[in-house]
């Protein structure tokens, strides 16, 4: 164990427990956290996809505790920041997917640091996207083993891999190699439980997969959609390889396997979106409702959980299950809750029924954060969604490329927009100016019937909670760089491209 984390263990656990952490505790559960990139909630057979066949994802679904109302942030880096800190991403300065606003606060305590201090060996494979240089890099944030590829999402085949700072050319498809790396990390002969964070690039653009995975979709959808679906099919194949690997090594019964995605639907939006409105980078359900399958074969019976849950809950849950205490300064800052009661109860239970979950798309032009307080924001409680899907009102924003650019074009009547060729009015739907809209997700999952006028008192109450939330985090967000950088001029013509 590295000295800095042995010190952290001493602070968290006391000297005796810290020594035990250094030696490695017996029979703590192994943990594998798989995070896919841009996969939609509907992108598997069990959720009704008309074209995708995903036998391994379907099997995991059937064997898992399934959180059917689990939410992430509407885009990539923000979700990763919230996932690893248990706090809304804005509180740690992450408001975009571009530098410097993707950089996660260097002072934040991350999940791998807590697990390392509790005796786990920690491995990261794949996409980081929280600042890859200097003290932002994963090897400086609690990961002992780090493996990724040179060129990120742009190199699909025969990548140069970097494992623990050593470069090695590899043959094959990038995601196959990522799963190979995860299995190599799992197989390291060390007497300690492991935490493996496997973050894929698939099915994020640019889109490409081995032909055998794209072939079933050719002629049924266009080439872009066939490549996207092929990437998901390849992920399913690799999930099957990993699950078989755990069985063969007799690790299945003592390994917690968590599978989730980082944001909503992208290039498969026009094919299937599970009846939801919205895509990645929108504030609608389709932008943030996520897969969340939790399997511990030796402990939990498969069941479906209807409670409102989120990426914020991953850190407190895994620390609880791993016996990793939270340092006193961190506990009050956490916005997530342990899911353990929901994982262990096969019947529905009351659990944080008054929870308020706040979302904001972020991604505004740098320097214009204050003007975007009410642009693309939402509050969710139970089955109710309070939402504003509007461009900001600041004239300065119009000269830059942002989500506001797309919303202005949709408000002007455009039918095509990012990720959709003909249904922008629905998926990028613009709400009325100057007010919030309210929807009952249970009765109206597509969010077509606005209840704000009918339920005006509740609307006002939720709107006030949003104001309080934004005002509480805004100073820290600004201090930690959430509004820094140079805005992207609209003349670059990248309004329809998303990272």
Regions found by a protein language model. Name each.
Residues 2, 6-11, 19-437, 445-468, ...:
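Formylglycine-dependent sulfatase
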Residues 473-474:
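Non-catalytic accessory segments flanking enzyme active sites
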């Amino acid at each position: 164990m590295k000295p800095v984390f042995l010190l952290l263990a001493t602070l968290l656990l006391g000297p005796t427990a810290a020594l035990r952490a250094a030696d490695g505790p017996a029979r703590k559960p192994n943990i594998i956290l798989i995070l896919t990139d841009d996969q939609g909630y509907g992108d598997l057979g069990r959720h009704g996809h008309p074209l995708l066949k995903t036998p391994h994802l379907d099997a995991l679904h059937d064997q898992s505790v399934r959180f059917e109302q689990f939410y992430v942030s509407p885009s990539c880096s923000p979700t990763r920041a919230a996932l690893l800190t248990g706090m809304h991403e804005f509180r740690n300065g992450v408001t975009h997917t571009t530098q410097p606003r993707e950089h996660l606060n260097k002072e934040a305590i991350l999940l791998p640091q807590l697990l390392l201090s509790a005796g786990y060996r920690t491995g990261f494979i794949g996409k980081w996207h929280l600042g890859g240089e200097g003290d932002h890099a994963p090897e400086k944030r609690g990961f002992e083993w780090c493996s990724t590829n040179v060129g990120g999402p742009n190199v699909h085949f025969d990548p140069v891999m970097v494992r623990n700072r050593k470069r090695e050319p590899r043959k094959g498809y990038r995601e196959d190699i990522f799963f190979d790396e995860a299995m190599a990390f799992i197989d390291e002969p060390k007497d300690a439980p492991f935490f493996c964070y496997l973050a894929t690039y698939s099915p994020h653009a640019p889109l490409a997969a081995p032909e055998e995975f794209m072939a079933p979709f050719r002629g049924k959808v266009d080439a872009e959609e066939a490549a996207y679906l092929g990437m998901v099919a390849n992920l399913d194949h690799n999930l099957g390889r990993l699950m078989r690997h755990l069985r063969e090594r007799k690790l299945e019964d003592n390994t917690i396997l968590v599978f989730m995605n980082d944001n909503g639907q992208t290039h498969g939006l026009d094919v299937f979106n599970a009846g939801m409105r919205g895509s990645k980078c929108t504030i609608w359900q389709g932008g943030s409702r996520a897969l969340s399958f939790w399997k511990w074969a030796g402990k939990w019976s498969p069941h479906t959980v209807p409670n409102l849950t989120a990426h914020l809950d991953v850190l407190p849950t895994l620390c609880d299950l791993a016996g990793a205490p939270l340092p006193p300064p961190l506990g009050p800052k956490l916005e997530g809750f342990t899911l353990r009661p929901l994982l262990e109860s096969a019947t529905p239970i009351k659990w944080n029924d008054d929870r308020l979950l706040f979302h904001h798309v972020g991604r505004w032009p740098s320097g214009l954060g204050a003007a975007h307080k009410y642009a693309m924001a939402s509050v969710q409680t139970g089955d109710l969604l309070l939402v504003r899907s509007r461009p900001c009102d600041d004239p300065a924003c119009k000269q830059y490329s942002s989500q506001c650019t797309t919303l202005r074009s949709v408000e002007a009547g455009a039918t095509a927009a990012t990720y959709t060729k003909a249904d922008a009015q629905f998926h990028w739907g613009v709400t009325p100016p100057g007010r919030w809209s309210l929807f009952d997700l249970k009765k109206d999952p597509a969010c077509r019937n606005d209840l704000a006028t009918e339920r005006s008192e509740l609307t006002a109450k939720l709107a006030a909670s949003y104001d309080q939330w934004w005002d509480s985090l805004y100073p820290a967000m600004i201090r930690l760089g959430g509004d820094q950088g140079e805005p992207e001029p609209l003349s670059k013509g990248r309004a329809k491209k998303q990272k």
